[in-house]
Regions:
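ATP-binding/phosphotransfer module of carbohydrate and carboxylate kinases, centering on a glycine-rich
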Residues: 1-75, 81-124, 130-154, 199, ...
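Short helix-capping/turn signature of helix-turn-helix
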Residues: 39-40, 219, 234
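Short clusters of small/polar residues that mark proteolytic maturation junctions
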Residues: 48, 77, 124, 180, ...
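Short glycine-aspartate micro-motif
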Residues: 98-102, 158-162, 228-232, 238-240
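Short, glycine/acidic-enriched loop or turn micro-motifs at the edges of active sites
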Residues: 105, 211, 235
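Glycine-rich phosphate-binding loop and adjoining helix at the ATP-binding site
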Residues: 119, 124-227, 352-363
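Short, active-site-adjacent cap segments at secondary-structure transitions
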Residues: 168-171, 211-213, 238-239, 248, ...
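Glycine-rich phosphate-binding loop of actin/hexokinase-like ATP-binding domains
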Residues: 225-279
Length: 411
């Protein structure tokens, strides 16, 4: 499978949740109101009017429509010192749903996400190597379970499916020991078309680590940062790039492909190793297996347990300097505000890796540039599937159809 991500334009100017009281803007202003509530939580109509610069009358009409459409819920009125009690409004979690599918090299994740962005159901399938037929069969089973769990009315509110997957599932064949037949099947397999045919739902696709970056951008620490590189460590390390609060995809949807970054000059007729060769979880998995331990422990709390920790520490010591080197090169080009690091591992491993990366950054020459601060990602292993689910939700309900536009609170 050679994934072709749905590349939305990044040229749109930055948008605040501010509406227009002119005619013909009903749908847009409804999206503005929904986004204001999404960003600010439980707020009153008066507060929505202040944030969006729409009139009180317009807000009253819009919120009535959204309440009638069951996209909003009224909460208990709050009495102030004077005047009528204010009625807080919140998003109705059952107002809409989306399905996120992460197809990885070692596992498959499927999430049912509600209108508030909360994960309602999850399924996981682990494997040694990704087989397209096995993956499609499991997705089909999970979608049937979702349809069974939701009433017919709620199933009609499913906005679509977002797929997060590597651009080239058959890549780095020798590194992972992939069977040539499996690689050939992936080259012929059209996952997006197969799932669309299976469900009849709209299907959107995005590179897996870019989808993870989407989740962090709109639901995590990225909401407070305008320019950052996002690093996600899984079987292979990868990433995403946010510039001026926009997710930057690049010409081929592959911006932020940190895993392919060379770690030095070619020499002796050999290519320099790439970052993914030395700073990926498959290396930690190999360490565990060599020590007679369970390789699957890379993604859970066992990696920080006494039995596993010496091997995890050795991997961190090997991994941190190359990541720091990648941050140096990225900063030279982009003048970064920060780096957000996350991955498919427990919080203890993430925290230790960040400390090691920060220490390794001190060993490089930063003269002429300002070193970025390294932050822990807030989403974790769900980031890729959650980012996939956010694709249809934001396409249908955000003020701008460009998902990759982060909205600021109007002041």
């Amino acid at each position: 499978m050679s994934l072709s991500p749905d590349n939305s334009s990044t040229a749109a100017s930055k948008l605040k949740p501010r509406g227009s009281s002119q005619g013909g803007m009903r749908q847009y202003n409804e999206r503005v109101v929904l986004q204001a509530i999404r960003l600010n939580g439980q707020i009153s109509g008066a507060e929505i009017a202040r944030l969006t610069h729409l009139t009180a009358q317009a807000i009253s009409l819009i919120t009535k429509r959204l309440l009638d459409d069951e996209l909003l819920i009224k909460k208990t009125p709050q009495r102030g010192k004077v005047g009528q009690p204010s009625v807080p409004l919140v998003l109705n979690p059952d107002g809409a749903f989306a399905i996120g599918v992460k197809v990885g090299r070692r596992s498959l994740d499927i999430l049912l996400v509600d209108f508030s962005g909360a994960v309602r159901e999850r399924w996981n399938l682990s494997y040694d190597f990704a087989d397209p037929n096995q993956i499609l069969g499991h997705i089909s089973q999970c979608l049937a379970k979702i349809k069974h769990k939701l009433s017919a009315k709620l199933w009609e509110r499913v906005q679509g499916i977002g797929i997060a997957a590597p651009l080239h599932m058959g890549g780095w064949q020798q590194l992972l020991g992939l069977d040539a037949d499996v690689v050939a099947r992936w080259e012929r397999f059209q996952l997006k078309e197969e799932i669309a045919t299976l469900t009849g739902l709209p299907v959107q696709t995005l590179k897996d680590t870019t989808a993870a970056c989407v989740a962090e951008l709109v639901a995590g620490r990225g909401r407070d940062m305008r320019n950052f590189v996002y690093v996600f460590v899984d079987t292979f390390i990868g990433g995403g790039l946010v510039l001026d609060s926009h997710l930057h995809l690049g010409k081929h949807g592959n911006a932020g492909a940190l895993g392919s970054l060379p770690l030095g000059l070619n020499g002796g007729g050999k290519h320099s190793p790439q970052l993914l060769n030395v700073a990926s979880l498959f290396k930690l998995e190999s360490r565990f297996i060599t020590a007679g331990l369970d390789g699957r422990a890379t993604s859970d709390e066992r990696a920080a347990s006494p039995e596993y920790w010496p091997h995890t520490q050795a991997w961190i010591a090997e991994t941190a300097p190359p990541i720091a080197f990648a941050m140096l090169n990225s900063t030279c080009l982009l003048d970064l505000e920060g780096v957000i690091l996350d991955g498919c591992f427990c919080s203890a491993v993430k925290e230790a890796l960040i400390v090691a990366v920060e220490a390794a950054m001190q060993d490089f020459n930063w003269e002429g540039i300002v070193a970025p601060q390294v932050f822990a990602g807030t989403i974790g292993s769900d980031a890729r599937a959650l980012g996939g689910a956010l694709l249809p939700l934001y396409a249908n309900f955000a003020p701008d159809r460009d998902l990759f536009l982060k909205l600021d609170n109007a002041q």
